[in-house]
């Protein structure tokens, strides 16, 4: 799971998320990676080199405002799997549906049991659309 060095708080959140995934989805063998900036994150995601990323709400809003072309590329090549209070877990369109389901269900279970930091927070004004599987698996 990658994040950008320029996205404040994303790396610590990613590391915490990996601890939770190691507990609830150990077969994923999740690891953290940091990219130098939004451009590199978008490149790695869109070319399927690293299919998952954590980005903050602020980072995404700033990217849309400061580099609309890069935001458009990210928007076209990604979908949201899970939304937290201040962060989003996104993936590319190549990520297998069974992996989406496993991650969503594991995080939802972790939040219900004891990990408030991964509580799902539905966003109405989402910049990157949810994967349809999210709505099938999580009842709103």
Where do the protein language model's features map onto the residues?
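Extracytoplasmic "Venus flytrap"
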Residues: 1-15
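A bilobed periplasmic-binding-protein/Venus flytrap-type ligand-binding module shared by bacterial periplasmic
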Residues: 2-3, 81-99
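Solvent-exposed loop/turn segments at secondary-structure junctions
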Residues: 7-9, 58-61, 94-97
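Extracytoplasmic/secreted envelope proteins and their assembly/folding machinery
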Residues: 11-18, 38, 42, 100-104
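Short helix-initiation/N-cap motifs at beta->coil->alpha
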Residues: 26-43, 128
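A ligand-binding cleft/hinge motif common to bilobed small-molecule-binding domains
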Residues: 51-72
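Short beta-strand->loop
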Residues: 68-83
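An extracytoplasmic/periplasmic, membrane-proximal ligand-sensing/linker region
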Residues: 113-140
């Amino acid at each position: 799971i990658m994040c950008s060095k320029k996205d404040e708080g994303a790396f610590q959140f990613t590391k915490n998320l990996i601890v939770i995934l190691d507990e609830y989805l150990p077969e994923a063998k999740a690891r953290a990676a940091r990219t130098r900036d939004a451009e590199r994150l978008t490149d790695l995601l869109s070319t399927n080199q690293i299919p998952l990323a954590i980005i903050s709400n602020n980072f995404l809003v700033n990217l849309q405002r400061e580099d609309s072309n890069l935001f458009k590329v990210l928007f076209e090549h990604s979908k949201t799997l899970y939304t937290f209070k201040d962060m989003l877990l996104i993936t590319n369109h190549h990520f297998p549906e069974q992996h989406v389901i496993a991650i969503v269900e594991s995080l939802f279970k972790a939040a219900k049991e004891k990990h408030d930091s991964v509580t799902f927070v539905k966003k109405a004004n989402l910049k990157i659309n949810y994967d349809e599987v999210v709505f099938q698996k999580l009842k709103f």
